[in-house]
Amino acid sequence: CHELGVSKRDAMLLIEMVGKNPFKIKNEVGKIKAYLGGDNFVLEEVKKIVSIEKEFQIYQIVREILTNNVLEAMDYLKKTKEYMGVLYSLYGELEAMYKISSLQKEGKVFSSNYNVFKKQFEEYEDIFKNNGRIPNPYVIYKKLGIEKNYTKDNLKSLVYRCWEVERDINTGKLVMAPAVDNLILEIISCFK
């Protein structure tokens, strides 16, 4: 990504969007260089031409839902039928937000500076452990601020609702598409 003259932050976002496969990164960088034709790198412009990984698209859609911008999310789900991917991602995001909110209710204050946050995260990393793995601090850092749009109790009940919806879809009690659509409506109804 240094060939494009991008900031470290934009380089990280670009890798997050296109994936970590070195061959794909090389191809995407070539495509971007040709597209820019010597102009400055602008991430929003580049997003239009890169081949974005499905996981990143789901992450973006979930972020839209959690920030109360659901029209794009509903369109995405209608086109792609990625209901379970979005459900699993919502579950993970809401669970992490609940943990952040709980720590803040206990008086913990997280820095808005990433380098300071990384050091703070070491103290709480076990709390965020999922399936035996500690997430990268940046993954948790990106959730800071979004959790403020929900009460701690709402986050707790939404985490439980995600689990219920997944269980009921898997046991055949609920139909996938309307169940996830209704869950999204529940989430936005809790938005402050």
Model-derived regions, located:
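Long, charge-dense, solvent-exposed interaction surfaces that engage phosphate-rich ligands
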Residues: C1-Y59, E64
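C-terminal alpha-helical interaction modules of replication/initiation AAA+ assemblies
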Residues: Q57-L66, V70-K192
